[in-house]
Amino acid sequence: MDISRLSQTEKCNLAIELGERAAKYFDNDAIKSQVADALNLAKMWNESEDAGELLYDFLDNEEHGFTIYQENEEDKIKINAWNCVIDAIAFVSKMAYLESGIKYLPEPIEIVDDDIFDHMENALRLCRN
């Protein structure tokens, strides 16, 4: 798929769809619920001025951040699922920040670009293998 032909909204929708596919690999109910909350917020990325920050908080939070969960995970399938979910939320977070006019982004979000879709798709492939 040629990502460059998609609009920003279509890219966000694709990222969310890939994140939802990856979320199916989690079996902990609390984690599944938190991921679902993040993906539901992502679906409203352009409806709230602080959506970028709220989405980023799901990624980088000392108590319940997705990156912390990923670092503590030992199951390779779930690590790859986290890769996809984190990438999806990061991409949508960046679009939400940009939509709201924020000029200075958190460093991990600043480097996000369309190449992240290759990483998400590869992570999903690794989940299935």
Segments and roles (model prediction):
Residues 2-129:
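Structured binding/interaction patches within domain cores
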